[in-house]
């Protein structure tokens, strides 16, 4: 395959001797070409017919990229060869990453995962059902008479973030500071390194954790800080690293997914009408939107030399496993760029795969379904503001920078 240079040669790492030149495809996960067409469209170039299932990019220090769903799933499942010890790219970010349990492999990971499940599992989500519903309705109703909003700022951020802050027992006035730090970890703007953002997050968490070890409540941080792993109390360091992960997950992923989904619905009145006329399809629509607008791309590190699908990988190589590419793989989903709410089999790895399947998926799905139902009930007809240029940002968690929406208040419905 002809080498495609997407990033300037000045930023390209030397090609390791074990990497064949025909597998080189210089894709920059933080600045892909054609990003203006949409972040998923920009990543879909990795699945064009002339691109191998496994490629090497010299961008961001140099790493492998699995481009097909089968390889992505196999690597997620095979933690003996593909370790979570260094899950972020570039390497310096991955080496600084020490959140628990996502930086661990089985069996060590399992006890911590069981503790995390106590704070974000289905029973917790069920208890939050009324609060989720109330907050969604309140936010949408406050926007409805205005006829316009920046959906990202006015709904996609405050809705899931306020739910998480409630779950964690943290004050809402801390949201701007925490959101800035999590953004620097997943879509950095250059103002902080990953390590600096992580340490700032830990500086915030340490006194809170110590306070709740002394006076525990029923919130997520108290449960983690006073939890048991492997038959012993969790240490302060372990609690800090677990709570750090909860904050990063709670303040970033659903925020961005909601904006991607609403951008699509704003441009597609026929899909909106389908859900208005057939609200029972909303759960299926949620799953199809999760497939089409998946947004996470994390990685693994090779624990030993290993031949994978005919390609020789070396110990210490990093491999990017873009979760979005499973759902966009035409080998798994026919016409993958097309959104079909009646799709019979929806295949994706939006919440990961294998031992690190996202524990927050139940809360995420609930928040998405409630948003679709309550928004379309109140504001059925809306569009992108005239002249607005929607910008996406690519990274470990991709996002929509701003989403200006408009509608005629006369067509809305107070509920």
UniProtKB/Swiss-Prot annotation:
One cellular-component annotation, GO: cytoplasm
Tell me the residue numbers annotated for binding heme: 358
Nucleus as a keyword of this entry, yes or no, is no
Q: Which SUPFAM superfamilies match?
A: Cytochrome P450 (SSF48264)
Output the superkingdom of the source species.
Bacteria
Q: What CDD domains does the annotation carry? A: P450cam-like
Q: List the GO biological process terms.
A: (+)-camphor catabolic process
Catalytic reactions of this protein: 2 reduced [2Fe-2S]-[putidaredoxin] + (1R,4R)-camphor + O2 + 2 H(+) = (1R,4R,5R)-5-hydroxycamphor + 2 oxidized [2Fe-2S]-[putidaredoxin] + H2O
Q: Which cofactor does it need?
A: heme
Q: Give the signal sequence positions.
A: none
Query: What is its biological role?
Result: Involved in a camphor oxidation system.
Which family is it part of? Belongs to the cytochrome P450 family.
**By what name is this protein known?**
Camphor 5-monooxygenase
Name its species: Pseudomonas putida (Arthrobacter siderocapsulatus)
Organismal lineage: Bacteria, Pseudomonadati, Pseudomonadota, Gammaproteobacteria, Pseudomonadales
